[in-house]
Regions:
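Canonical P-loop GTPase G-domain recognition
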Residues: 20-33, 162-213
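Conserved G1/Walker A P-loop phosphate-binding module
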Residues: 5-99, 209
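Structured catalytic cores of enzymes that bind and process phosphorylated ligands/cofactors
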Residues: 43-51, 55-57, 68, 80-81, ...
Length: 213
C-alpha cells in the first residue's frame, strides 16, 4: 500500500494465541492523546460502519459480548481500549455512515488524524473491509490516510461466510488487486465460522511483540 510502513505480517496459526489471555475493557476515550497504564503496544482496528468490527474483536479474544455490537451504526465516536497481558486492542470508530452530519465527519477525521499521528505505542492497524463490497470513496480516502501515516497495516476481509468458496476466492483476488496487493498480503476472516481468526490473532500478537522488543 504505497509509502506506508512495513505491512503487518499475515501469519498462519493452528491455535488462537489471544483467546487464552485475560482481557479487560479499559475505557472509552475522546482524546487520542490519552495515556493508558501500563504503556503497552497498541493494535488498532478500523473499518466502515457495519463491517463487523465488534464481532471480529470478540472472536479474536474469545469473549462474546466484550465489544458491544451496536444496533446504531455510526454512533460510536470514542476510542475503546481493551487490555490483554501484552498489548492493547483499540477499537476505532467506524467511518462512512451515510447519516453522519458534516460536523460529526469532521470530528471523526480530527480524532483519527490525532490518533495516527500521536500514538507512539501504535504497533499496527488492522483495516477491515467487507469482502462482498467494492472499495467505496470512503475506503479509498481511508487508504490514502493510512498510507500517509506510514503505519504498518494489514487489510482484513470480513464476512467470508457470506460467499460460496468459489466466489470467495474470486472476491479475495479482486479486492486485493484493487488495493494493489496480492492475496497473500491480506487476511480473510469470518467471525461466525472462525475462518482466519487464529491466523489474524497470531499476526496481531507478532506485531505487538515486535514493537515491544
Amino acid at each position: 500500500m504505497g509509502a506506508q510502513g512495513a505491512p503487518l505480517s499475515h501469519s498462519i496459526a493452528a491455535v488462537n494465541p489471544l483467546a487464552s489471555q485475560s482481557v479487560e475493557f479499559v475505557g472509552s476515550f475522546p482524546d487520542p492523546r490519552v495515556r493508558v497504564d501500563p504503556p503497552l503496544p497498541e493494535i488498532a482496528f478500523i473499518g466502515r460502519s457495519n463491517v463487523g468490527k465488534s464481532s471480529l474483536l470478540n472472536a479474536l479474544v474469545g469473549r462474546p459480548g466484550l465489544a458491544r455490537v451496536s444496533g446504531s451504526p455510526g454512533k460510536t465516536t470514542l476510542l475503546n481500549f481493551y487490555r490483554l497481558s501484552r498489548l492493547y486492542l483499540v477499537d476505532l470508530p467506524g467511518y462512512g455512515f451515510a447519516r453522519s452530519s458534516k460536523s460529526a465527519r469532521a470530528g471523526y477525521r480530527k480524532l483519527l488524524h490525532g490518533y495516527l499521528e500521536t500514538r507512539q505505542t501504535l504497533a499496527g492497524i488492522v483495516w477491515l473491509l467487507d469482502i462482498r463490497r467494492d472499495l467505496s470513496r470512503e475506503d479509498r480516502e481511508m487508504r490514502e490516510l493510512l498510507t500517509e501515516s506510514a503505519r504498518p497495516v494489514l487489510p482484513v476481509f470480513t464476512k467470508a461466510d457470506k460467499l460460496t468458496r468459489s466466489a470467495l476466492h474470486t472476491r479475495e483476488r479482486e479486492l486485493a488487486q484493487a488495493l494493489d496487493l496480492t492475496p497473500d498480503q491480506v487476511a480473510v476472516t469470518s467471525s461466525r465460522t472462525g475462518t482466519g481468526i487464529a491466523d489474524l490473532a497470531e499476526s496481531v500478537l507478532a506485531a505487538a511483540l515486535r514493537e515491544a522488543s
